[in-house]
Amino acid sequence: FNSNTYASVHGLEVYTADNINYDLAKNLVKNITETAGIGYSSNKISKVMNGIYTRTFTESEIESSSKENEEKGRVPYDITTKSNYYYIIRETGGIVTGAYVDNRNEEIKANPYVKSNVGSETYLLELGYISNNTDLDNLLNNMDKYAEGIIKSITPLYK
């Protein structure tokens, strides 16, 4: 679930890696909105198409991250304005998302997917806004419908 200072912001947001085949993302959006009765998000920031978003780093975020890492003596992420902002998408996607580690966890010496073309295809599903009463009520009263929409999108991939 997402939140916003404005209670009027609402709807489903599916975050993806940049420049992918959007077929699964489109199916997720279609099936979740149809089965759960939630609409597309009204959020316009990072929007690729209705309900689908790709969030990448901004120049100021890169500068801030570099400065913080330098101050703490860490090797910074090798990020650009094309790098996926969300860790779960960036770190599991292999070459396509530029998966890497930045030495914050000394026990992790290397990301096994950094040079792999078989990293998993990762999506971040934000099923509505907790700050919007309609979205929150819909989720609390229709959890099974949200799950049904997700299952309906994924099961054809394994048949």
PLM region descriptions:
Residues 1-159:
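Active-site-proximal helix/loop segments of hydrolytic enzymes
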